[in-house]
């Protein structure tokens, strides 16, 4: 190799943080009838599942997790393409066509109570993969914070109201802490301090404003955190 450079070979590469990504995130392809079991069998401890019928483009995206759905049978679930709450989404129904299921590992054991923030949260976390699932009850107070059980600051955050109709609010480090984008919409980022209180996540908590979509008083929420 030229002076000041190294040869391109695996011995000269920095060891990856995650050597086998399929331990923490994987994808299943199967019939609609079998996609639930196929997806939940992926990764070491599948704790978050996202299912979509590949054969029918008008069908819903089905999301569920092991904090709210201990048995991982798809009930309760939410739909990423709608504002519906868990009651409206109802009982899981298998897709009719060949489907895809994305699975994320969310750690082992029961959810833990996290009191790092001003609002207590129930959390399943896989810090090795930088992923956690948090559920909490809003208090309507701007600047309220919620613990996420990860070792690094959250880079991408998805929050959904489980108890009321609301959009899927997302914060990403690339767009900053003053705006949100929405899974269920094709609109551009919307700036509003009521979303995140103009505050970026830390290595222990994320912060919410007063908007009903993430902090309505008495409403229940789920947050998916990616560090």
Residues of each region from the PLM?
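Surface-exposed molecular-recognition determinants
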Residues: 1-227
């Amino acid at each position: 190799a030229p002076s000041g450079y190294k040869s391109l070979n695996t011995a000269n590469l920095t060891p990856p943080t995650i050597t086998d990504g399929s331990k923490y995130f994987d994808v299943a392809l199967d019939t609609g009838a079998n996609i639930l079991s196929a997806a939940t069998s992926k990764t070491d401890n599948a704790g978050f599942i996202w299912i979509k019928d590949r054969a029918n483009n008008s069908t819903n995206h089905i999301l569920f997790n092991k904090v709210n759905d201990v048995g991982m049978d798809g009930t309760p679930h939410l739909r990423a393409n709608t504002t519906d709450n868990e009651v409206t989404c109802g009982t899981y129904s298998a897709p009719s066509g060949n489907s895809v299921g994305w699975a994320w590992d969310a750690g082992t054991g029961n959810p833990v109570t996290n009191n790092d923030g001003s609002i207590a949260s129930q959390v399943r976390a896989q810090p090795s993969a930088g992923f956690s699932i948090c559920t909490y009850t809003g208090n309507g107070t701007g600047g309220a914070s919620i613990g996420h059980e990860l070792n690094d600051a959250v880079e991408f955050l998805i929050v959904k109201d489980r108890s009321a109709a609301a959009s899927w609010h997302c914060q990403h480090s690339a767009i900053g802490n003053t705006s949100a984008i929405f899974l269920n919409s094709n609109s551009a980022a919307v700036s509003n301090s009521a979303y995140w209180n103009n505050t970026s996540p830390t290595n222990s908590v994320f912060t919410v404003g007063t908007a009903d979509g993430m902090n309505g008083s008495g409403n229940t929420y789920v947050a998916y955190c990616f560090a």
